Amino acid sequence: MAKFTLSSTGYCWLNNRGQSHDDVLGVVTHLDHMVTLLLVELHHCNKLSLPGAPAPPAPCLEHLLSENLLDKLYEWGVKTGRYGNAVRLEQLKLYEQLVSHSRHQLLVHEPFLRPLLKILDSSQNEIYPPDVEKRLVILLNQLCVALMQNVHLLDLFFFSNAQQNGNGGHTNFIIFSLLIPYVHREGSLGHQARDALLLCMALSQKNSNVGKYIATYSSICPVLVTGLGGLYSRLPNQIDIKSVDWYRITTDDVTEMPELTLFMNSLEFCNAVVQVAHTAIRQQLLDFLYQGFLVPVLGPAILQTNVESQVSAMAYLDLIVRSVSEPGLIQIIVRFLLDTDKFDGQRILDVLVERLNSNDSRLCMITLSLFDTLLALNCEDLMLELMLKYLLNCQHVPISHRYKVNRSDPYGSAVEYFLNVAPDIMKKVNNVLNTNNYNGNGSSAGNGGRQTISKTIGANWNHYGMNTGETLLASYQAYLLDARNRITQCKHACDQWNNIYRYQKLSKLVNSGVNGGGHSGEDVRTYKVQMIKNFLAEFTTTAPDSAVELLLDQQQQDHRSSQCQSPAQQHLHQQQQLQATTKQLDSLQSLGDSSGYESLNIMTICSGGGSAGGSEDGRRHESWKVSSVKEDTVVDLDLSEDLFAQGTVSLGPFLTAIWGKLQTFTSNCLYVNLHLTGLISHLAWFPLPLLHSILLRPDIPTTSDTPSFHQVLKILKQQIDAELPECEESLEIVDVARSFLVDREFRLINMRKNAIESNVVLGGSGPGGPRLSNGGGGTGSSITSSLSQTTPMQLTPSSSYDPFKRNDTKRKSITNSFSSIFRRPGSSGGSNSNNSTSGSLGGSSSVTPSLSASQHHLPPSGSGSSNSSPSTTTTTGSSGVSSLLMVGSSRRESREAETQFMDHPSLPVGIGSGTVGGGGAAGPASLTSMAQPGSGHSSLEYSLVNGVGSERQRDLAVCAVVLDEWLKELSAITQEQSLVMVAAATSEQQPNRSVVS
């Protein structure tokens, strides 16, 4: 029967006349029967058998190969005319099923391989219907899987034009060339094509012919880059999202935007190619990406002058940086930011720094978020260009205080400093909370005394199950744990850098030279003479060569006499010289201090004895994290020009912009302050004493041209203390502000669960999401994306919802279920306790869903932070959700998860584009403007309007709460950094790493 079926199939194409519809239909029917019989035989052949047992018979397969039926089928299909695509579709199905079930057994038989190569070769440069394209891509994918498992079969699919036409030509990898046109396709077709191409890229690592073909003759790299640029040009030029706290594109936003989905698919594919491809292919693709996408496409987009276009371009850049993971791609992005030749001498990084000073709150927020993303790369070159090159010579620190830079002892006083610089009203609040907690656990007499202290503080916390205590994180240990995790991760990344950035004192260099620890006696002698010569040159127009020569002669005589002494006498003489030199240097330093000089001119001599290649064997550097500065680079720090300078040292545009934004802390938008404090805390994580000298060391004064960080903190404290005095009214305002921020925290923590419940209750519909306008102004076509389908129900402190209550384990009543089904629309049923409010604060009961949720993706966090109390945060797997104020390390995860609670229509002018620092026509965003009656916000937000105090006082109260929690976080970071420095001092110094000082 099987042989009859195969024979009848062969009779159909013996007729050379034109094929009718019935003939084609008959062949297709017989092909189905033939494939079924062949699959049954292949199934029996693939079964495991005992050694030495005879192979099972396969008459159908033998007949198929012996009679060359597949070759005849191909020749017959060429003559089918208008039915050619239908016949080709059936042939592709046949090959697909046989290849997938036979593994590689049939590919080694010429009667099977020859017609397969013919049909593949004839498919080049052809346009097929979608169903034929789908089958072709599936077949190519199956072939790539088979070749990946059997690399020795690769040569079967390499053939040149000479083999067909006899006129020569380069070798062609037919499978790869057929897949290239489908690399940017949408849907499953493009996904399977990209998977197959990745398998081919992986094969290039195993077979040199594949790597040579792809790198030399294939057009995959230009196709990928041009396609990526084309997909970027299709992205909306303006992102119009009705939310004041929007700052980045999340993963959920990508899935809601088809254009962005295609772009990200292409970008992720490029990232995967760089990861698995041959070295030649990888380098070629990186060059094309830099020259064909970053410079001509992304660069001009970032340099646009329109604010809305700048916001969208920077949002796309932030998404790109967060999405790529391969070091090669990150390296060219860093190179793109630092390039000075491609954009008329203007660096992209400098442009981004300038936008930190923008008066547009949205542009400022997204710029702060972008720099937070860039800092998370832990890239040495970026840190060097942003800050370290301005701090390396330590000119910002007076001479008399430079010895403190590398010491860890004064860190203890810095911890107390940050706690003491908090606003007085917050100290009063913390005292009241501590007293209330103590009296609540004590006698009834203590409870009576609580009302005499404050009738408001702590009153709004009972529905959360407990008072939070000294911090909104419920425990200072939570800050310590989070700071420890972040500092450890950052230090581990910075250990791969080429250089250790710290200030090297003179005494250390002299001691190492005297003791033979890296400098010869002649080097130290020359060093001291040069130092004295430079110092004396500051006071005379002509260099006092005679004095220096006398000193030089004296040094030479001492050196000659020391050669005639015994080793013990030489050692004693060296110690005496060292003491004399130290006294001279102390006198010079005191002279500079008494004269008001800020620094002393020191020219460092870097050690040349370290081996540059020794550390390469012990660890693997990630090239993009490591600076392009070579390890054996000699850094010459000439400080002579700074000897008489006072207050003229610049910390660089980046730190200057951050300090300037911090000075307007009380006038900034709340969300700008959250991003700003988070960025500064991120800087404090780095294990860089030079950076600590301006952030975590209040005992070290600075001589910069702007107020120091600690001076700004004192100014903010004085400003808040002056406008928010310690009184009962201020305590009440602060209490409302704390409750507002706690309510915001629990909305973030329970966002995912509330989003699901919201979709169930609202039927998947919600308020309008962000609108993406393609083009400038209002002339472009608009693309509306319903990102608000995951909008969570807003929970207020006045509601009966208990965040610590477990899920209800009671069984649902069938009667109530049927009653709810058949209830009339106008009837009132049982209310859900989770959606009802008690009216204890707002005086009314309402259901208040949040207005937008375009950011609700929780990224994985490696911090491994845990909760020290139930009221801290919830942790699921490796995802972290921050504290309610999102201070420090946890702030980043919470901002990633943050939903948008405000809409522009319900806000006055200035919320979305408020000025920072008081300039401009539009005022800064205030909390009062965030809670307009009837806008659907929580009762707590409404109480901000109807509460006591002026609008300015309510805004200052929120600033005071944020500042207080941030200072506690900085205190915890300082404490943990001191422990890290102590541990590093006790461990052995790693060899072969140069010290940049």
From Swiss-Prot:
Residues 763-780, 911-922 have a biased composition (Gly residues). Residues 569-579, 781-792, 830-889 have a biased composition (Low complexity). PANTHER family: FHIP FAMILY PROTEIN CG3558, RAI16 PROTEIN-RELATED. It comes from the Eukaryota. InterPro entries: ARM-type_fold, FHIP, FHIP_C, FHIP_KELAA_motif. This is FHIP family protein CPIJ015043. Belongs to the FHIP family. Residues 558-579, 759-922 are annotated as: Disordered. Pfam families: DUF5917 (PF19314), KELAA (PF19311), RAI16-like (PF10257).
